[in-house]
Amino acid sequence: MALFSVPTPVTTILLDIEGTTTPITFVKDVLFPYIKENIKKYLLEHWQEKECQEDITQLQKQAEKDSHIDGFVPIPSAISDNETENMIQAVVDNVYWQMSLDRKTTALKQLQGHMWRSAYITGQLKGEVYEDVVPSIRQWRELGFKLYIYSSGSVEAQKLLFGFSIEGNLLKLLDGHFDTTVGHKVESKSYRNIADSIRCSPENILFLTDVVKDMPLYLVTQESYPEAVIRGVCC
């Protein structure tokens, strides 16, 4: 992480995950491939469970919203047990399609989070973090800063990554988590929602991310809102 001085008004640090606390390669080369390689097996094993069916329902609703998009993959409803296999394949195809477009819909992230949970609990996955992350977080906590995570990955997926990390359980070092349910990272309203949720003035929040395009225009033009620090580059 680039060396920088935390602005005086800041009391809260908001951390992105991919490319900020965790190598992009972990997400691209470990987490995403795990989904593609195991989704059909997971659906077959958990199909009758309430949680899995809720995930499917959310994916179907998202598919309906996506019907206007070129190349979208529909997810039909299974009328009989004989059609279950076809429906499972439709879900697999839809997930593949969304992932090929690097989409970050809440429905997709929810299913992915549940799949990763199973893998973390069984020891198939360990969350990766950069070697400077834990020392930095500990230092910030000692200085009295509040620390939150804001990522496009679901809150559950975030907690799994930090709860089952290569550095052990890091959840005790964090004060909370936010995902796309508060809005997307490119939307200024999302940051106001977070500020309201933690009862903190926006000017007291520092957002750390590695992706400039994730910062709404006001983050880099308005001094009264959170600033941003890019891994490797201070701005």
UniProtKB/Swiss-Prot annotation:
Positions of substrate binding: S151, S152, K185
Entry GO CC: cytoplasm; nucleus
Cofactor annotation remark: Binds 1 Mg(2+) ion per subunit.
EC number: 3.1.3.77
Pathway where it operates: Amino-acid biosynthesis; L-methionine biosynthesis via salvage pathway; L-methionine from S-methyl-5-thio-alpha-D-ribose 1-phosphate: step 3/6; Amino-acid biosynthesis; L-methionine biosynthesis via salvage pathway; L-methionine from S-methyl-5-thio-alpha-D-ribose 1-phosphate: step 4/6
Keywords recorded for this protein, A-Z: Amino-acid biosynthesis, Cytoplasm, Hydrolase, Magnesium, Metal-binding, Methionine biosynthesis, Nucleus
One example GO MF annotation: magnesium ion binding
Enzyme class label: hydrolase
The keyword Cell inner membrane belongs to this UniProt entry's keyword annotation: no
Catalytic reactions on record: 5-methylsulfanyl-2,3-dioxopentyl phosphate + H2O = 1,2-dihydroxy-5-(methylsulfanyl)pent-1-en-3-one + phosphate
Cofactor: Mg(2+)
Any one GO BP annotation for this protein: L-methionine salvage from methylthioadenosine
Pfam family, one: Hydrolase
InterPro entries linked to this entry: Enolase-ppase_E1 (IPR023943), ENOPH1_eukaryotes (IPR027511), HAD-like_sf (IPR036412), HAD_sf (IPR023214)
Residues that coordinate or bind Mg(2+): D16, E18, D210
Subcellular location(s) per record: Cytoplasm; Nucleus
Subunit organization: Monomer.
PANTHER family in the record: ENOLASE-PHOSPHATASE E1
Function text: Bifunctional enzyme that catalyzes the enolization of 2,3-diketo-5-methylthiopentyl-1-phosphate (DK-MTP-1-P) into the intermediate 2-hydroxy-3-keto-5-methylthiopentenyl-1-phosphate (HK-MTPenyl-1-P), which is then dephosphorylated to form the acireductone 1,2-dihydroxy-3-keto-5-methylthiopentene (DHK-MTPene).
Protein known as: Enolase-phosphatase E1
Organism: Xenopus laevis
